[in-house]
């Protein structure tokens, strides 16, 4: 049984939540997010508090209710504070520039890599080797960061590549003769 689903979500001031059947729309100063919940979840909005419970006749009701609660809580946090991912580029000649919604990366290939940011995501190049991605949708921010990292993931021998700011790269020792 999920303990996460039992905890209610208090809606902060300045955030508007609309529940229409299984659709939940959350609107705040950072934007608007919409989510479709599983049929195994019953959602109730009363007096600025959102509560979740499993629907009758579903085997995995509590698990789905816990997932729905986590998703809606991330939506509320996203429209109030937003989410941020920092990427670091390590390697000789590895550079990043941001031009509007396109991130241009020089990662040691014979050609530069241009990544089109998804809608609702903003990028700032703090330096030539640091990119900060920000947005209201946690999943989209993480997915964009993962796609940029996938162009050149950190390799274990020298540590060169694109990494998250808090990522620890496991290093290997070079082969000895």
Curated annotation (Swiss-Prot):
Keywords: Ribonucleoprotein, Ribosomal protein, RNA-binding, rRNA-binding. GO terms for biological process: cytoplasmic translation. The keyword rRNA-binding applies. It comes from the Bacteria. Pfam families: Ribosomal_L6. One of its GO terms (cellular component) is cytosolic large ribosomal subunit. InterPro entries: Ribosomal_uL6-like (IPR000702), Ribosomal_uL6-like_a/b-dom_sf (IPR036789), Ribosomal_uL6_a/b-dom (IPR020040), Ribosomal_uL6_bac-type (IPR019906), Ribosomal_uL6_CS (IPR002358). One of its GO terms (molecular function) is rRNA binding. The keyword rRNA-binding applies. Part of the 50S ribosomal subunit. Belongs to the universal ribosomal protein uL6 family. This protein binds to the 23S rRNA, and is important in its secondary structure. It is located near the subunit interface in the base of the L7/L12 stalk, and near the tRNA binding site of the peptidyltransferase center. This is Large ribosomal subunit protein uL6. It comes from Psychromonas ingrahamii (strain DSM 17664 / CCUG 51855 / 37).
